[in-house]
């Protein structure tokens, strides 16, 4: 492990166009449940009788707007979550002009909360909301502080600005993400299984020098990586910062 940390530190220190790609594992340490792993949010809400995929779908929003709104308020508004050391480390490297930014599969908005400026949120963010009817914009604090569920302009359902099942990923976000990956000298993957498509397929466009994967479990890209660390990323980053 120590040799891996030394290699990681050397690569990070010698890179000046790092792109980060993050998944659910990064946010677990902040108290955000992993949507897919055992014991995660998907397992918890599937006990309610409807599939998690349906509860997070465009169909559910259209079939039962009230049910969808109530589900979002009950299950998705992570009020007390704060960035952890991994989010802070990524933001610091961007401030130091070593990083092109971060691409994330997460919807919790914690990268922005940590101070990262160049964040591409592939699946949207819970930091923004909008009316499903008239598209008036709302902030997360608007929704939480006022327990706001319906638009004060037209009465429509206020939904989070996330990509639901049955919706397309935002193409400008995909293009920016591809640009980050194609121009990176080092790509650091953190806390992602790299199996959820099409987001994970973006990794195949990396042509730089160093692909680093830090994840508890194996990924389909491990064999192509310069360095693979199967460990808890919070522990890895803490150790790295004390090297």
Swiss-Prot record:
InterPro entries: DHS-like_NAD/FAD-binding_dom, NAD-dep_sirtuin_deacylases, Sirtuin, Sirtuin_cat_small_dom_sf, Sirtuin_class_U, Ssirtuin_cat_dom. Its main location: cytoplasm. Nicotinamide binds at residues 35, 107-108. It catalyses: N(6)-acetyl-L-lysyl-[protein] + NAD(+) + H2O = 2''-O-acetyl-ADP-D-ribose + nicotinamide + L-lysyl-[protein]. It is found in: Cytoplasm. NAD(+) binds at residues 24, 35-36, 105, 107-108, 123, 192-193, 215, 232. Binds 1 zinc ion per subunit. Its cofactor is Zn(2+). Its EC number is 2.3.1.286. Keywords: Cytoplasm, Metal-binding, NAD, Transferase, Zinc. One of its GO terms (cellular component) is cytoplasm. Residues 1-243 form the Deacetylase sirtuin-type domain. Zn(2+) binds at residues 131, 134, 151, 154. The keyword Ribonucleoprotein does not apply. GO terms for molecular function: histone deacetylase activity, NAD-dependent; NAD+ binding; zinc ion binding. The active site is at 123 (proton acceptor). It comes from the Bacteria. Gene3D superfamilies: SIR2/SIRT2 'Small Domain (3.30.1600.10), TPP-binding domain (3.40.50.1220). The keyword rRNA processing does not apply. Belongs to the sirtuin family. Class U subfamily. NCBIfam families: PRK00481.1-1. NAD-dependent protein deacetylase which modulates the activities of several enzymes which are inactive in their acetylated form. This is NAD-dependent protein deacetylase. It comes from Staphylococcus aureus (strain MSSA476). The gene is cobB.
